[in-house]
Amino acid sequence: MSDRFSLRDVTLAVEPGQIVGFVGANGAGKTTTIRAALGLIKLDAGEVHLFGQRCGADAPDESQRHLRSRIGLVLDTCPFPSTLKVGQIEALVGPAYPTWDRETFAGFIKRFGLDPKAKVKDLSRGMGMKLQLACALSHQAKLLVLDEATAGLDPMAREELLDELLAFVADGQRSVLLSSHITSDLDRAADRVICIDNGSIVF
């Protein structure tokens, strides 16, 4: 992506209880849009609102921390230090979230079949995704954002992830933004799909 890349007239809303698919070719602006929505880059124009509150790189730090604590992020590659063990991730991530629940995290680690003694670098792509998801689900997030998280997963792992997302929004109070190029995943799980091309929303 060039330094001159920009988003233009992007309007994107994710309502409670929805899984919204977000599609576009590589370099179309999906990740940039997600970074803007999370307040990680400064906007030249426009505003981002999360849970009814304005959020952005120029918003007060305390406000940003509070809003981001309600968001769970799952990336295409596991971002945790490669030499840490699964059981050590809680000490790294937990303090960042006042709503972190140790029992919930331990439950997901067991449910997902993650070995607490395994190092991050030795996890398969699917297990790395599950570790991220366990973290995202352990601090009572209201919005899950997945940036190509299903890419490279085998069909069974993708099915398991989609099942978790559907269960996550089932109460009608939580939402998912699912960036993916795998249309079958979106057909199965998404309530609606938004397409971006060259920095602009197409539909």
Positions of predicted regions on the chain:
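A short, flexible loop at the N-terminus of ABC-type nucleotide-binding domains that lies
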Residues: 1-9, 16, 57-61
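ABC-family P-loop ATPase nucleotide-binding domains
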Residues: 75-132
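Conserved ABC transporter NBD signature motif
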Residues: 46-58, 66-67
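Catalytic Walker B motif of ABC-type/P-loop ATPase nucleotide-binding domains
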Residues: 144-148
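The feature captures the beta-strand-to-loop junction immediately N-terminal to the Walker
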Residues: 23-25
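Helix N-cap at the start of a conserved alpha-helix in ABC-type nucleotide-binding domains
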Residues: 28, 155-157
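Helix-to-loop junction immediately C-terminal to a conserved catalytic motif
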Residues: 38
